[in-house]
A protein has these predicted regions:
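Extracytoplasmic/secreted cell-surface and envelope-processing proteins
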Residues: 61-63, 94-97, 130-136, 160, ...
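Oxyanion-hole/transition-state-stabilizing segment in secreted/luminal serine hydrolases
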Residues: 100-141, 165
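Charged helix-capping and loop-helix junction motifs
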Residues: 137-145, 178-183
């Protein structure tokens, strides 16, 4: 049985702990094995593709040692020399990101990459801080404006749902998911604006529940910090974002390099670290 088929069976099986039916096999990035053959195509496109990342601390570059968001790990998955500009900012909401000038820097980066002749992808992932100060609907209004302005400079928008927190319920099997409404709003806006979507929230919840609290907390920046990532966490979830892009957007997404060893562990629900 091929690796692709094994992944489909494993991820679609009934979860024995939670009793929930997991997503359909076609959602599973088992196709990565076959995407390896496209490596030459990605390499050729490297000079003509760029990425600009926006969001909060779960995407941002780390400001202290052994920390960072998934953006670090995602940029590391690209062919060498591919521009990957991380404009995400710690503590940001969809409102503060605009008022403090971070959004202007994001758009200007995208504008320059487009002017340089590159196909430019701009990722947008918020929710962790928005949930503290605004409704999902208010965040959605801000996301719609972001998408319009990304398109206005000739770039492609990718909305990404919030990376899960790693707070487990008392059963030590399921997560206390407080981000769901904001993730659902992101999905709704992607449908309304007919733009690209990466459902990182769904798949990070699935993965964290599969590996359990002990392994999940080994990805924490600090022992009791279930939101922010250490260097290992950035590698795992950066790879997850890369794989989801390959699954949902390939071959248009550009020079993302496969990592079958790491992906195999992630998509069979095994702890990497």
């Amino acid at each position: 049985m091929r690796f692709l088929e094994i992944l489909g069976i494993l991820v679609c099986s009934l979860d024995s702990v939670t009793g929930r039916v997991l997503p359909k096999p076609r959602d599973v990035p088992g196709v990565l094995t076959e995407l390896v053959t496209m490596k030459q195509q990605w390499d050729k496109g490297a000079a003509n593709t760029s990425y600009v990342l926006s969001g909060d601390s779960t995407t941002a570059n780390g400001t202290v040692p052994n920390s960072g968001g998934w953006g670090n790990g995602f940029c590391a998955s690209l062919s060498p020399g591919t521009p990957c500009i991380n404009r995400a900012k710690n503590g940001a909401t969809t409102a503060s990101f605009r008022t403090d000038g971070s959004w202007n820097m994001t758009i200007e980066s995208a504008r320059q990459e487009v002017a340089n002749g590159r196909k430019t992808w701009v990722t947008v992932q918020f929710g962790h801080n928005d949930m503290k100060v605004m409704t999902p609907e208010a965040m959605g209004v801000n996301l719609m404006k972001f998408v319009d302005e990304i398109r206005g400079v000739g770039a492609e928008a990718i909305l990404i749902t919030s990376l899960t927190r790693r707070n487990f319920n008392s059963d030590n099997a399921t997560l206390d998911d407080t981000l769901g409404p904001w993730a659902n709003e992101t999905i709704l806006i992607s449908e309304q604006k007919q733009t690209h979507l990466i459902d990182l929230h769904k798949w990070s919840v699935w993965y964290v529940e599969k590996i359990g609290p002990d392994a999940a907390h080994r990805l924490n920046r600090l022992p009791d910090d279930n939101t922010h990532l250490n260097a290992n966490g950035t590698t795992v979830f950066g790879r997850m974002v890369a794989d989801l892009m390959l699954l949902g957007l390939s071959p248009d997404i550009g020079p993302i390099l496969p990592n079958i060893s790491l992906s195999s562990k992630i998509w069979t629900g095994k702890a990497v670290y």
